[in-house]
Amino acid sequence: MEGNAQIRIASRSVFGGVEDVIRLEGTATVEKTDYGWHLQYEAVNCEDEKSAVRSDIKLETDTRRAIVVNQGEGYGLLLDPAAVTATQIKTPQGSLTLNVKAKEVTWDLAGRKDGSVTLEYMLLVGMQPLSALRISLFLKK
């Protein structure tokens, strides 16, 4: 599924026992690479049509890992189901270091017209859960 596509995103997070679902729509570019797939997208929140997200995702076939860089938020994630990784998120008080425990990193981009990516992970302070997230991306040419 290389080339330009429309993207729909469902972002589900649970923080402090409260679930929040955000739906976004936009455009994406998908490229087959030596390591797997490279996906870049820009999407707008369907509810307020104001907040936008720009992300760059590298999907590694051999390791089944995802490297996610959220361009507007100023942080990146290494989602590796085989290991706990770490990230730093900028806050008004400075940088916050969080551990990242990936539960699911899957994708199906081999089709000509449709594709999908699922990223499910938990952010932890030390080893204490902070929030659980599941990002589902649906692509259509």
Predicted segments, located by residue:
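N-terminal intrinsically disordered, cationic/polar leader segments
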Residues: 1-118, 128-130, 140
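Charged phosphate-binding loop/patch that engages nucleotide di/tri-phosphates or the phosphate backbone
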Residues: 133
